[in-house]
Amino acid sequence: MIDFGNFYSLIAKNHLSHWLETLPAQIANWQREQQHGLFKQWSNAVEFLPEIKPYRLDLLHSVTAESEEPLSTGQIKRIETLMRNLMPWRKGPFSLYGVNIDTEWRSDWKWDRVLPHLSDLTGRTILDVGCGSGYHMWRMIGAGAHLAVGIDPTQLFLCQFEAVRKLLGNDQRAHLLPLGIEQLPALKAFDTVFSMGVLYHRRSPLEHLWQLKDQLVNEGELVLETLVIDGDENTVLVPGDRYAQMRNVYFIPSALALKNWLKKCGFVDIRIVDVCVTTTEEQRRTEWMVTESLSDFLDPHDPSKTVEGYPAPKRAVLIARKP
């Protein structure tokens, strides 16, 4: 059973303590609910991983842990087998004692695009909404954050995060909670809030922006990354049944329309800091994610379009401030 007690003890002593009025009951309810059919297998994989404290830990340039002496072939094989039990691995990569987890997404590329535009993360308390396996949280810690809290209801991602955390020496500077943003009270407690790859999955995107704002302290910074299309401030794509084979894509605005949405929600100092087309080098099938990936979702005769005929995925990063 994954234990959240360390997180409760941690926030009991800081400005997130008021979260304890609701959080333990929510987590207890989650633990009582019907778990995914493979959850026991996943949590066992975490449990059977060895307790290792890294001799060298690099979270600034990557997520890399190394031991003072090389692990035996048997130890490496054990780690690799258990981590493969947690496939598919979508967000990464991770390099853990000679086991290189080549994930579907090169999330390090996204981080390299975002990082130069952020306010200094040193000492900050951060919320990462829809954090997946938690890759970016470890990079936030590497960039100096005091505490990174991720929320994502996907149970596999929770187990992937806990597996990586265990191999990083049970590092307590990052925590993942199996919750959605709609389950959080208006904490108004985070210096920086990240929402990357979430907005287009929300039926009400403006409500999502308000929810993000409710988590920020005054003068806090929002980092928003999402799918966009070309166009002016009035351009929004509402896909039909699917977009790039995804059923749960509701609104894809232009970057300028998204800027207006942020303004409408009361954000200020709104900047479009990056816009780029997603390539099949950044998102692709690997040995750690063996099912369909981006190349399967694009028109084989015209990769500038999805298989449904929409513009191929393009992503923008916007940064804004809560006054």
Swiss-Prot record:
Origin organism lineage: Bacteria, Pseudomonadati, Pseudomonadota, Gammaproteobacteria, Enterobacterales
Enzyme class: transferase
Binding, carboxy-S-adenosyl-L-methionine: K91, W105, K110, G130, D152, P153, T154, I181, E182, M196, Y200, R315
SUPFAM superfamilies: S-adenosyl-L-methionine-dependent methyltransferases (SSF53335)
Pfam families in alphabetical order: Methyltransf_9
EC identifiers of the protein: 2.5.1.-
Top-level taxonomic group: Bacteria
Protein's organism: Escherichia coli (strain 55989 / EAEC)
Family recorded in the similarity comment: Belongs to the class I-like SAM-binding methyltransferase superfamily. CmoB family.
Subunit structure: Homotetramer.
Keywords per UniProt: Transferase, tRNA processing
The gene coding this protein: cmoB
Catalysed reaction, written as an equation: carboxy-S-adenosyl-L-methionine + 5-hydroxyuridine(34) in tRNA = 5-carboxymethoxyuridine(34) in tRNA + S-adenosyl-L-homocysteine + H(+)
Record's keyword annotation contains Transferase: yes
Molecular function per GO: transferase activity, transferring alkyl or aryl (other than methyl) groups
GO biological process terms, semicolon-separated: tRNA wobble uridine modification
UniProt protein name: tRNA U34 carboxymethyltransferase
